[in-house]
C-alpha cells in the first residue's frame, strides 16, 4: 500500500514537469503533419520536446503564448509535435514505420527543445535549439518565409 501511495505522489509531483505541445495550436503527429504538408504544399514546423523538459515549458509559456506568434505559425506552417523519447509508432508517407524517438534521432534532436522548419518533403530549412523568446520565433518565421519566397505573411 505504501508503494502505491508513493507512486501516486511521485506521479502528481512529476506532472507539472511534463512538457507538451503548446495549447491553442493545431499540432499533429509527425506522420499526419507530413501528409498534410505534402497535400497543401506547405512547410512544416516540427517541435521536438519531451516529458520533463523545463526549457520546453518555459518556451511554451513565454513565447508560444503570444497571439501574434500563434497566428503566424498557424497560418504559415503545418505544425508537428514529436516527443523525442517516445516509442509511439508512426507510418511516414513513404510507408516507413518509425518511432517518434527515431524521428528525433534522424533530425538530431538529442536535446530539447529543438524546433525544425522543413520543406513539405521533410528537408530541414532552419533549426532552433533551446529556449526561444517571442522575438526568436518571429525572426525565424520571417527568415523562413523570405527563403520560401514570402508565401506567408511577414
Segments from the language model and where they lie:
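Typically the conserved alpha-helix immediately C-terminal to a functionally engaged Cys/Sec
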Residues: 57-72
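The canonical Cys-X-X-Cys-His
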Residues: 53-57, 115
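Positively charged n-region of N-terminal signal peptides that target proteins for export
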Residues: 1-4
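Non-catalytic, surface beta->alpha helical segment in thiol-disulfide oxidoreductase systems
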Residues: 62, 106-150
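A short beta-strand-turn-helix
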Residues: 26-44
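Thiol-based oxidoreductase modules, predominantly thioredoxin-like and allied folds used
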Residues: 24-27, 69-98
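Short active-site neighborhood of thiol/selenol oxidoreductases, capturing the structured segment around
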Residues: 40-54
